[in-house]
């Protein structure tokens, strides 16, 4: 097993690439599925990674706080389930039900979406602002500055980015280093 580094050249202010992925609810989703929203919080995450598990409740809180404001979470699992069986579609469905996910949890089964975004870790967040028929990247990176303990967070990068967009302002910190487990790729 070799871990693929970022192959994408997705930068801030770029148009996000579209996708067509199946969610744990059996529905197929693309960026067009969320055309009515002002922005999207795309989170590459998974079941098995301890970092992703530490952030799971915070991801749920982001959706609870921002979905009503037009900024929902979309979670995408990029790992190959043959390498990490805990990240199989069936286990994703079980996890989504157990944790009461309020957002779509999608499988990047062919592993062709995460490289286009340049995701390298789980979790890795991309905040996309909807500008007509385009979703423009406004933030890339970590959820916050403390994966170990939510009560010790000093910088809430994603919340700060979304709050700035909601206020019509520039995102204060546009990019941070994603902290998490490397994405497990079947071709590397």
Where are these regions (language model features)?
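Chalcogenol-based redox active-site neighborhoods
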Residues: 1-166, 172
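Cysteine/selenocysteine-centered motifs that mediate thiol-based redox chemistry or coordinate metal-sulfur cofactors
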Residues: 161-188
């Amino acid at each position: 097993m070799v871990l693929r580094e970022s192959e994408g050249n997705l930068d801030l202010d770029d148009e996000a690439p579209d996708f067509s992925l199946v969610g744990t609810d059996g529905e197929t989703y693309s960026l067009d599925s969320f055309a009515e929203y002002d922005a999207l919080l795309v989170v590459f995450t998974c079941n098995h990674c301890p970092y992703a598990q530490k952030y799971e409740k915070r991801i749920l809180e982001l959706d609870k706080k921002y979905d009503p404001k037009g900024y929902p979470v979309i979670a995408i699992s990029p790992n190959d389930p043959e390498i990490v069986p805990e990240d199989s579609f069936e286990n994703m469905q079980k996890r989504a039900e157990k944790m009461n996910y309020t957002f779509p949890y999608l499988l990047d089964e062919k592993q062709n979406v995460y490289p286009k975004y340049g995701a390298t870790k789980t979790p890795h967040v991309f905040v996309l602002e909807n500008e007509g028929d385009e979703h423009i990247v406004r933030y890339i990176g970590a959820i916050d500055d403390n994966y170990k303990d939510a009560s010790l967070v000093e910088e809430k990068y994603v919340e700060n980015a979304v709050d700035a967009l909601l206020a019509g302002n520039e995102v204060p910190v546009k990019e941070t280093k994603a902290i998490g487990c490397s994405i497990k790729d079947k071709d590397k």
